[in-house]
Amino acid sequence: MKISSGAINFSTIPNQVKKLITSIREHTKNGLASKITSVKNTHASLNEKLKTGKSSSIEFALPQKIKDFFQPKDKNTLNKTLITVKNIKDTNNAGKKNISAEDVSKMNAAFMRKHIANQTCDYNYRMTGAAPLPGGVSVSANNRPTVSEGRTPPVSPSLSLQATSSPSSPADWAKKLTDAVLRQKAGETLTAADRDFSNADFRNITFSKILPPSFMERDGDIIKGFNFSNSKFTYSDISHLHFDECRFTYSTLSDVVCSNTKFSNSDMNEVFLQYSITTQQQPSFIDTTLKNTLIRHKANLSGVILNEPDNSSPPSVSGGGNFIRLGDIWLQMPLLWTENAVDGFLNHEHNNGKSILMTIDSLPDKYSQEKVQAMEDLVKSLRGGRLTEACIRPVESSLVSVLAHPPYTQSALIREWLGPVQERFFAHQCQTYNDVPLPTPDTYYQQRILPVLLDSFDRNSAAMTTHSGLFNQVILHCMTGVDCTDGTRQKAAALYEQYLAHPAVSPHIHNGLFGNYDGSPDWTTRAADNFLLLSSQDSDTAMMLSTDTLLTMLNPTPDTAWDNFYLLRAGENVSTAQISPVELFRHDFPVFLAAFNQQATQRRFGELIDIILSTEEHGELNQQFIAATNQKHSTVKLIDDASVSRLATIFAPLLPEGKLSPAHYQHILSAYHLTDATPQKQAETLFCLSTAFARYSSSAIFGTEHDSPPALRGYAEALMQKAWELSPAIFPSSEQFTDWSDRFHGLHGAFTCTSVVADSMQRHARKYFPSVLSSILPLAWA
């Protein structure tokens, strides 16, 4: 029996080892069994030994040189193996075949052949410095593969030492992988050969169809320690899988769907990684190398390990390509900066947070030098593309969101190119958001855009007063944004101190009302009136309000109060009682106008006015009633005889015997889409309408302290009566209902103040059915 030398590199073995190998060959040729001396023999059959659980030890005398050739740990293995070989003699058990001395010899020779080959291979790498296996893999003293040190993780399973027949199709490869993965999941320790899927073909395989769901779950099962080098994954779907300590060197992952795929502690060097555009969630790379791997411009590289780049040429792709280096990774660039290329490569605000800017910036800060170098190469490419301002305009925000932050601000090249871009971005922000609310700032906006706007206001301090609507919003979001840094808040507070010192602002803050009442803002509480907006038309007019009020007026709810602020003229507080909020916002503070109008359109009280006072018959009166809803107090009063008579003529047909006529009641239900509503829902709406007409009759609108239009009081009371008939449960009590009814008419000695009745009813509605009240009551009265 011969020992094959095919796996042994004899050119690197010292002469004494060569002699040992020659000696071993001679022993084998002459019959190694002749060197085996039986010291102990137990004449028992194999079956009897298995039954009794006993074994008869047999010691074999091998040449000491052969024993010394093995590693200490393998000597133990050798001894254990040898002493379990049994020299079974014939015990006259019928049908039992004995193991002959020749079989024993063959068994020992096979064992030795395997270990000699392994030990010699191991010796090659430990003693002679032979080149490591491809991909940086070498064999250590314990026969385990390692990867070169530095910033490269300890991964990459060793190559298989014995050839096996390969599957012939992607389906067969998938079946083989499924079998191996399930065995590993069951706790079986797989050999290197079991985990060797080099040169595999997984094209068009959807892994979720061949693996259990547990492999696709978050924190689920892991595919660990497999060798996928030189494999094809084209058009496959490996989404939601976790590959740990795997090797993908020289593999092709073209058009692979890898949504939320995780690669950890893996070797992905020299990989063609152009994953499919249908990938919804970016794959992640944790402690993984990507040397000379081609990466799409929309990847997340936050966990990648970079090494020094070599002199390799860029990868070749169909149709040609333009590339830049990011450390030792290749990033693909467009051949030409067309409009589509600018949007696709640079506009992460339009592409779900993905762009080449975000890909480069996703690297950890320890790779700042590599990040700056890559961004400079990108800027050079953009500059060489001779892009017009119109072409850059849609991506200005994306550009400044990255390049206007460290470490890129350290680069003179980037600063010089970005300066005009940032100026145009700031001008557009001032033009757009001085008169309308900024979008509700998310984490991205708080961390990337707000600091840029602060920096722009710092460079152009005049804009603080000329665009105080935008400036106050920026400061507001910097001070309240949960994702803003302390540095951002400190800079915002410092800029606001500059703003308050401006001659157009300072006269309004020394009135005992602003901030902490001494002219300084109090940022410890959101209730302090820290914000001061200048009128867009009159520099002598300003609005002072708190953090909470400013937030709610910019992003209102149906319950937002639109009068919870100080209106200042020459620094003095003036009443807003007779000022229409919509006119104030339209003329002086347009930043609130759109939000106010949007809320106003949801108030449907005017529909009842149109039913009672049609524009064809009562155009002037209709306008007076509508105009009164736009302010808290009206200078128009309807208590003169002519007005009282006219109102009585209009409302009398609607109130036969003091109650709503059936026809008018049906008109109300139809106007407010209540025909099929429950009696309670109908009652709540009528109650709120009654509240509004009580306000009409009060001294705040068409009445005075001593008199009010009887028709309006009667109509308000009739609406309330109908609500009581439909659902008494919506009232506080029958006693309260009676009290309100008496006050409308001054019965039983009740004080006839409809202003008190209106306020009381409004408080009750806001507490028990606020959404109904908010859909009806005019904003100025809310």
From Swiss-Prot:
Alphabetical list of InterPro entries matching this protein: SopA-like_cat, SopA-like_catalytic_sf, SopA-like_central
Pfam families per the UniProt record, alphabetical: SopA, SopA_C
Catalytic activity as recorded in UniProt: S-ubiquitinyl-[E2 ubiquitin-conjugating enzyme]-L-cysteine + [acceptor protein]-L-lysine = [E2 ubiquitin-conjugating enzyme]-L-cysteine + N(6)-ubiquitinyl-[acceptor protein]-L-lysine
Annotated Gene3D superfamilies: E3 ubiquitin-protein ligase SopA, effector protein (NleL), HECT-like ubiquitin ligase, Putative secreted effector protein
GO MF terms held by the record: ubiquitin-protein transferase activity
Annotated Low complexity bias: 157-171
Disordered: annotated span: 137-171
Active site positions: C753 (glycyl thioester intermediate)
Entry EC number(s): 2.3.2.26
One BP annotation, GO: protein ubiquitination
Annotated SUPFAM superfamilies: Pentapeptide repeat-like (SSF141571)
Subcellular location field: Secreted; Host cell
Keywords tagged on the record: Secreted, Transferase, Ubl conjugation, Ubl conjugation pathway, Virulence
GO cellular component: extracellular region; host cell
PTM info: Ubiquitinated in the presence of host E1 ubiquitin-activating enzyme, E2 ubiquitin-conjugating enzyme and ubiquitin.
Described purpose of this protein according to its UniProt entry: Effector proteins function to alter host cell physiology and promote bacterial survival in host tissues. This protein is an E3 ubiquitin ligase that interferes with host's ubiquitination pathway.
Family, similarity comment: Belongs to the SopA E3 ligase family.
Name of the protein: E3 ubiquitin-protein ligase SopA
